[in-house]
Amino acid sequence: MSSPENPASNVLKRAEYATLYGPTTKDRVRLADTALTVEIEADWSGGPKHSGNEMIFGGGKVIRESMGMSHIPRRGDAGGRMPVDTVITGALILDWWGVVKADVGIRDGKIEAIGKAYNPETMNPIPADEFEMPDRTLPGDTLPQTAKPTNFVVGPSTEVISGNGRILTAGGVDTHVHFICPEQIHEALASGVTTVIGGGTGPAEGSTATTVTPGEWHITRVFESLDAYPVNIGLLGKGSTVNADALNEQVDAGVIGFKVHEDWGATPAVIDAALEVCENRQVQLALHADSLNESGFLDSTRAAFTKDGKKRSVHIFHVEGAGGGHAPDMIELVKEPNVLPASTNPTRPLTVNTVKEHVDMMVVCHHLNPDIPADMAFADSRIRPSTMAAEDLLHDMGAISMMSSDAQAMGRIGEMVMRTWQTAHVMKSRYGPLKEDLANAKVRTIADDTGLGSKHSHNADTLIPNDNYRARRYVAKYTINPALTHGIDGHVGSVETGKLADLVLWEPKFFGVKMHMVLKGGQLAYAQVGDANASITTPQPYLPRAVWGATGRSPLRNSYNFVAPGVASKLNATIVTVQDGNGNVTEVKTRGLGLAKQFVDISTGIRDVTKADMKLNDMVPDSLHVDHNSFEVTIGGATTGDARTELNGATVPRAYVSEVPMGQRYFLF
């Protein structure tokens, strides 16, 4: 393939190049059967500017001895060059920071490098200043240092995963999981989720209703139960008490934060007490507020967030309110800069069936009696299609920052990723391109009109807006933003160097629906695999199955238990020997919990995280009001979608979708 600046007679046609190596710069890829398309902003693995050394594995391909594979051993050479353990070749990375094609190197279970894999004995590295860079128009929209491209070595110790023609995302972070049954973990992995945060002890009434693992004894037992599963774990303790000692002992036992839930009590006094401990211990508070308004209204809860002039950060679960929270105006909290708002997936997006299924779900989850009028009035107060419609819009504006599942307690753990992209599709279909994507397209139009189109990295055939910014906004909702909210963004949540290689590969036609492979800590843990007795890997039944990273002792090495700062060292297993006066060992003790999975402290700056830190989802509406009689929602400062669509200050229309993508085309049931 040649560049416009260096035409050649042996030019490889774009379609042929995509067939051989996957799409490259300026090519577009449709996400499953949605209306969303992403466009590759830069190709660091080859493409128009550096074609000829693309790394491909297979018969007659490049990654072979004396060709693309170096002879350098894993320990490195005299020049300090050390081959990676695994290379993912030519993958289309979709992350909050961009849409690029690159080779990805993994070493010691972490992302070592993003850029160009090569053999230094036969290939020249790409100079740092010659890597193609995304062409951005928005102020501050730049690559983080940990996503900058570089060259890295493939050697005899390197495994190869073909990412060519496939999409690579970070593993999902689900912050609202009721730990009801072990099968949930398999469903999560099969959907591309690699970190689960929540609480529960099994199908007890307290766990089916609330995301809480209460007290030291239960916390220890649940950690023991989850030790052999290849997912990162964060447990939420019971925050519904004004007793600081009861809260602190749960932090010492290993919780990542607290859940205050109305079924246990969500009074202003409880919220204040829990936040005080959160501030002291540097953990997060997740809130399911008082739907019945028994102990106060929304203003009472909002006031409890503030102490000594500081607006303390709070992670609000299902901020729309159907999952719980002050009726009918819980959604107004998206206006607060200290509120980190999230949705749960049963209301995403608003369809003709959404309202109907919620009543039965609520009766089961919250232990209600359908024969008691007061119980049914409680259920009805939470189900408001008007606020669900506003939730659609607020997600597209970037005013609701996160998505989660509410697994088996009104939500589906295997559908968090899928519901996110269904929402994005609905909004694209309804309102057109985002203003940010329109802005990029406008720059291209100017370049074309002024005769610069041929020199511009995007030519006339791609002047129609892509959906890159919208896609980056939505992928951030279940990756980097929940990781930031719970202080684990230094380890997971994005495709950046230094982080755990918790990665998901997707075939574009199955994007967001059925993953191709899931890497957990650099090891393949889940994948689409056919009949184990077949002669090859693809014969039916072709299903998501656990592979070696999910078996034996592998999960103990490729996954973490996240705990509060300073707690990991107390819980990690250490062997202590007791000797007598003659130096003879008389006793061997194990300190900590004696578990094999490593406990890791979360970051210490978690209490300073605000909505302004939410990647591409930091929008604070000028105003948002819910009419207490009609439940209609009015949003000020609404700037989503096509610039010709005016919603600022207008009542949000109730728009029920009758058909969504990623549905019956992919599933029998």
Regions found by a protein language model. Give the residues of each.
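Flexible loop/turn segments at secondary-structure boundaries
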Residues: 95-96, 101, 113, 120-121, ...
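Glycine-rich, histidine-containing beta strand-loop boundary motifs that form or position
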Residues: 106-108, 115-116, 181-183, 191, ...
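Di-metal (Zn2+ and/or Mg2+/Mn2+) metal-binding site signature of metallo-dependent hydrolases
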Residues: 166-188, 630, 634-635
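Divalent-metal coordination cores built from histidine and acidic residues
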Residues: 2-75, 130-169, 185-270, 275-278, ...
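Active-site microenvironment of metallo-dependent hydrolases
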Residues: 1-144, 189, 194-195, 384-402, ...
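Residue-level marker for buried hydrophobic side chains located in beta-strands
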Residues: 159, 171-173, 285, 403
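Active-site core of metal-dependent hydrolases
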Residues: 257-471, 486, 528
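Buried hydrophobic positions in well-ordered alpha/beta secondary-structure cores of metabolic enzymes
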Residues: 91, 109, 165, 176, ...
